[in-house]
A protein has these predicted regions:
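N-terminal secretory signal peptides that target proteins for export/translocation
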Residues: 1-17
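Cleavable N-terminal signal peptides
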Residues: 24-25, 35
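Beta-propeller domains with acidic blade repeats across secreted/periplasmic ectodomains
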Residues: 37-242
Length: 242
């Protein structure tokens, strides 16, 4: 797969006239690397004035959420059940080292980095690799040890993938999707479904309910209000929002 620059944050070095941002174009996640092997195809994309787009990383299977460390960028592959550590050692905006640091995971989608540690999620579990960048810089062989944070999450795979992130309160926020397209009974059986939750001292608490399938959220930098995207019901047709 081909990874295209995402919108997480502006790059620190803005010497060039063109603003470069880390920007993942969701549509590109479903194309093979060969689809963008010819850079001329990138010209088919419409960009705002003053922006450029270029291939940032290749040969990553279905990359999903991205998180930035101090020296590395981390992403997850749901289809392969893997976590990747990416590095751009010469700062040319092209990844030159791509390493798998966890595998054999159950539909891993979510990753987040905090205080030197990398957290990542399966459908029903959340793990952490402590001091991950120092481990990578020490050129260790194999894979780093991962520590289980929780396995107390529903294991239903329908909308079971987890996007994760720490909030301004330093608590870990995790959406739990509805295990269906449209349903009520399943939600009554387990109140965690169709919600956004946060981990507070080892216990889960609800932040929002009635959230069918959130695959992205963040906080307002000033008010600290939580904003999230929610995927609505499927199969309404081309003329109705979903």
């Amino acid at each position: 797969m081909t990874l295209i620059f995402n919108d997480i944050a502006l790059l620190k070095d803005l010497k060039a006239k063109t603003i470069k941002c880390f920007f993942i174009l969701h549509i590109c996640l479903f194309y093979s690397a060969s689809s963008f092997a010819d850079n001329s195809k990138l010209n088919l994309l419409s960009l705002p004035a003053g922006f450029e787009i270029s291939i940032f990383a290749e040969n990553i299977s279905t990359p999903r959420q991205i998180t930035e460390g101090s020296e590395y960028i981390f992403t997850a592959s749901g289809s392969k059940g893997q976590i990747y550590a990416l590095s751009d050692s010469n700062s040319d905006f092209v990844i030159d080292n791509n390493r798998i640091i966890a595998n054999d995971l159950f539909d891993s989608r979510g990753v987040t980095y905090k205080d030197g540690d990398l957290y990542f999620a399966e459908v029903n579990k959340i793990w952490v690799i402590r001091d991950v960048e120092n481990w990578l810089n020490d050129n260790n062989e194999g894979m780093p040890e991962k520590e289980l944070i929780t396995d107390n999450l529903p294991s239903n795979p329908w909308h079971g993938w987890k996007w994760i992130k720490f909030g301004p309160d330093n608590k870990l926020y995790v959406p739990v999707g509805a295990p269906c397209n449209v349903c009520l009974e399943e939600l009554e059986d387990d109140s965690r479904f169709a919600s956004i939750m946060r981990l507070n001292d080892g216990n889960w608490e609800h932040v929002a309910r009635g959230v069918r399938n959130s695959i992205g959220f963040d906080w307002h930098p000033v008010t600290q209000e939580l904003y999230f995207a929610d995927n609505g019901r499927d199969w309404l047709g081309d003329d109705s929002p979903s």
